């Protein structure tokens, strides 16, 4: 757009924008009566179309009245950029990751100018600059859920796998567990975590441990299922795996409030069952554990082990 007589007549009714991407410049105008209703998404789409950036990840910045280069990331700071257009909104478009301000922080240019020569005479070493980028692409990778539903001795964990960048990172095996029933304590087959892979998702979250017993996979109880069936269930739900486990180390389970302290534990239920049936109460061997939790014995080398999930 050229600055001629018609511009001087109409510049009060339009917002003039001058955008720059690499060595490419564009000039366009936005009617002032509609500028207040322009959304960030609509403005970004307009810039994207003018500079043909459909396949380019880019950031938008503008020169404020104080001389700082500030980002445009939402409707609020887009409106601020319109207010600072005196008389022209200077827009800088950069590829994502190439911006100096994106790496070291926005709004630091005016601070350097006002310090002047005093910054050169400072005796103290400069503070370390931290790289704080725009908040985006945050993804949940793990969480403990249903704390108010799951029994105190159990833990329900959600593992979220994004793409193929990192495996779930744990192996499972079959073994023998115990259950407290009306007939007393009985041995049943169970599924246990046998190994955690270094750098895997399960190891990095710290929510799963070796010898933890797997009770449910995405709401489906694993009791009575084979090792291959449980493995297939985990692989099918790998991108949003919800696994309920009984941790081998009960010291790391979440403690409940005072209202939950009256709930009998497994040993008390076992004692009550033995007394009711007239049996003899004997201490149950816990594989060397002193905290009352059940740690399944390690199997031999010929134990079956699922592939890495």
Curated annotation (Swiss-Prot):
* Gene coding for it: par-6
Q: What's this protein's function?
A: Necessary for apicobasal and anterior-posterior asymmetries associated with cell adhesion and gastrulation during the first few cell cycles of embryogenesis. Required for localizing/ maintaining par-3 at the cell periphery. Regulates mes-1 expression and/or localization pattern during early embryogenesis. Acts together with par-3 and pkc-3 in maintaining epithelial cell polarity in the distal spermatheca. Plays a role in endosome and Golgi body positioning.
Q: Where in the cell is it found?
A: Cytoplasm; Cell membrane; Cell junction, Tight junction
The terms describing its cellular component in GO are: bicellular tight junction; cell cortex; extrinsic component of cytoplasmic side of plasma membrane; P granule
The species is: Caenorhabditis elegans
Say what happens when this gene is deleted.
Answer: RNAi-mediated knockdown results in a diffuse distribution of early, recycling and late endosomes and Golgi bodies and reduced intensities of markers for these organelles.
Q: What is the lineage of its organism?
A: Eukaryota, Metazoa, Ecdysozoa, Nematoda, Chromadorea
Its keywords, alphabetically, are: Cell adhesion, Cell cycle, Cell division, Cell junction, Cell membrane, Cytoplasm, Developmental protein, Differentiation, Fertilization, Gastrulation, Gonadal differentiation, Membrane, Tight junction
Q: What is this protein called?
A: Partitioning defective protein 6
User: Which family does this protein fall into?
Assistant: Belongs to the PAR6 family.
């Amino acid at each position: 757009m050229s600055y001629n007589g018609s511009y001087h007549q109409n510049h009060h009714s339009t917002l003039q924008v001058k955008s720059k991407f690499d060595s490419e410049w564009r000039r366009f105008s936005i009617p002032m009566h509609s500028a207040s209703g322009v959304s960030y998404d609509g403005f970004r789409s307009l810039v994207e179309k003018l500079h043909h950036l459909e396949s380019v990840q880019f950031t938008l910045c503008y020169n404020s009245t104080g001389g700082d280069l500030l980002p445009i990331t939402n409707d609020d700071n887009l409106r601020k950029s319109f207010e600072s257009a005196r008389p022209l909104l200077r827009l800088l478009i950069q590829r994502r990751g190439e911006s100096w301000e994106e790496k070291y922080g926005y709004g630091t240019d005016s601070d350097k100018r006002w310090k002047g020569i005093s910054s050169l005479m400072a005796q103290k070493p400069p503070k370390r600059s931290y790289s704080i980028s725009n908040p985006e692409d945050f993804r949940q990778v793990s969480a403990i859920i249903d704390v108010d539903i799951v029994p105190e001795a159990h833990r329900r964990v959600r593992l979220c796998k994004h793409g193929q960048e990192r495996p779930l990172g744990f192996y499972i095996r079959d073994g023998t567990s115990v259950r407290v029933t009306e007939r007393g304590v009985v041995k049943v087959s169970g599924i246990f975590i046998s190994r955690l892979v270094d750098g895997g998702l399960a190891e990095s979250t710290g929510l799963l441990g070796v010898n933890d017993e797997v009770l449910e996979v995405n709401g489906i109880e694993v009791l009575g299922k084979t090792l291959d069936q449980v493995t297939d269930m985990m692989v099918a739900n790998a991108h949003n795996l919800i696994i309920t486990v009984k941790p081998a180390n009960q010291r790391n389970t979440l403690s409940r409030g005072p209202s939950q302290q009256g709930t009998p534990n497994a040993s008390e239920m076992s004692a009550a069952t033995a007394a009711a049936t007239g049996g003899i109460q004997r201490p149950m061997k816990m594989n060397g554990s002193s905290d009352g939790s059940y740690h399944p014995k390690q199997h031999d080398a010929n134990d079956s082990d699922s592939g890495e999930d």
